[in-house]
């Protein structure tokens, strides 16, 4: 390995693990915040459970990604077949949970916001139950499409083999036949189009409701809207930003995946795809925390308690 390649690998390693570090810290804060709010007995919002769940999923997924990617920089492979299959399949499994939970969150928020005259209003009472069943079903379906990893993932024995698609120094994918590749490509395309399309529709629906709400508020007040947003509007904007960010990341990830298939697992494309694929898991909790006004109230309350304790002890 020459000096330029060494510098490139070092810079890439620092950049990727910085992203992973930010993601782990942000998801841990978001998960602890929702846990603490639940322990304190605050009345939870209907979207708190899906957001807390996706924070936990992203936390585990990023830890797995860090462990798998560390093997990418090892001087020699050290995993066996079982380890490769286990870690790569678990990573894909938690990615599927992330996508399905994000889709469930967008649909759930759209159902909550729909007016009573809408056909979606009849799902309001039973929406948590229905969406939980939908989440479980889609997670199983999403993961089953990636079940071929249990067969295709193997420990890399010879780095000079031209038939393998390299994932890390220790793990590779066996090449698939053209018929199997077409089958899995069709299933993957159907899966992505369905989930991303569902999220896109629910996002557009929420944006439409938000615009209508602003228009009606302006008509009632006969003036410009107050710059202070209501909690409901902040919740809508948070979900809209999450969905928009997810759709952008998913589009880039799909393009990179397709490009890797065309160019037979090019390593440079894989190096670009890794941080792109984990961008949503790493930075989405920052969007939620930035728009979470309850966090500010919680921090002020904790600060007041610390000040009181210090005054009592002194």
Curated annotation (Swiss-Prot):
Extracellular side: 1-18, 70-88, 155-186, 257-268
Glycosylation sites: 158, 266
Transmembrane segments: 19-39, 49-69, 89-113, 134-154, 187-207, 236-256, 269-289
Top-level taxon in the UniProt lineage: Eukaryota
Pfam family, one: V1R
Keyword Disulfide bond attributed: yes
Cellular localization per UniProt: Cell membrane
Main localization, broad class: membrane
GO cellular component, one term: plasma membrane
SUPFAM superfamilies in UniProt: Family A G protein-coupled receptor-like
GO-annotated biological processes: response to pheromone
GO MF terms, alphabetically ordered: pheromone receptor activity
Signal peptide per UniProt: none
Keywords for the protein's UniProt record, in alphabetical order: Cell membrane, Disulfide bond, G-protein coupled receptor, Glycoprotein, Membrane, Pheromone response, Receptor, Transducer, Transmembrane, Transmembrane helix
Cytoplasmic topological segments: 40-48, 114-133, 208-235, 290-314
Disulphides: 84-171
Topology in membrane: Multi-pass membrane protein
InterPro entries in the cross-refs: Vmron_rcpt_1 (IPR004072)
Function according to Swiss-Prot or TrEMBL: Putative pheromone receptor implicated in the regulation of social as well as reproductive behavior.
Stated family: Belongs to the G-protein coupled receptor 1 family.
Stored PANTHER family: VOMERONASAL TYPE-1 RECEPTOR
Listed name of the protein: Vomeronasal type-1 receptor 95
Organism: Rattus norvegicus
Organism classification: Eukaryota, Metazoa, Chordata, Craniata, Vertebrata
């Amino acid at each position: 390995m020459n000096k330029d390649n060494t510098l490139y690998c070092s810079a890439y390693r620092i950049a990727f693990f910085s992203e992973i570090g930010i993601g782990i810290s942000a998801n841990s804060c978001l998960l602890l915040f929702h846990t603490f709010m639940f322990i304190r007995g605050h009345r939870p919002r209907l979207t708190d459970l899906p957001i807390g769940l996706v924070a936990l999923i992203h936390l585990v997924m990023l830890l797995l990604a860090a462990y798998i990617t560390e093997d990418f920089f090892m001087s020699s492979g050290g995993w066996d077949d079982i380890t490769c299959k286990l870690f790569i399949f678990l990573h894909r499994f938690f990615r599927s949970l992330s996508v399905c939970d994000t889709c469930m969150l967008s649909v759930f928020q759209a159902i909550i916001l729909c007016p009573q005259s809408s056909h979606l209003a009849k799902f309001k009472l039973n929406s948590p139950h229905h969406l939980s069943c939908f989440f479980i079903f889609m997670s199983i379906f999403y993961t089953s499409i990636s079940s071929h990893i249990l067969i295709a993932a193997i420990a890399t024995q010879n780095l000079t083999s031209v038939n393998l698609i390299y994932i890390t120094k220790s793990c590779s994918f066996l090449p698939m036949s053209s018929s199997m590749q077409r089958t899995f490509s069709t299933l993957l395309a159907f899966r992505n189009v369905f989930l991303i399309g569902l999220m896109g529709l629910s996002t557009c629906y929420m944006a439409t409701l938000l615009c209508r709400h602003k228009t009606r508020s302006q008509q009632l007040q006969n003036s410009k809207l107050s710059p202070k947003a209501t909690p409901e509007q902040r919740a809508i904007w948070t979900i809209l930003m999450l969905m928009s960010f997810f759709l952008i990341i998913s589009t880039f990830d799909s393009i990179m995946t397709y490009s890797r298939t065309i160019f037979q697992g090019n390593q440079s494309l894989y190096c670009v795809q890794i941080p792109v694929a984990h961008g949503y898991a790493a930075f989405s909790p920052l969007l939620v925390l930035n728009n979470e006004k309850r966090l500010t109230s919680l921090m002020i309350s904790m600060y007041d308690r610390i000040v009181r304790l210090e005054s009592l002890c002194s």
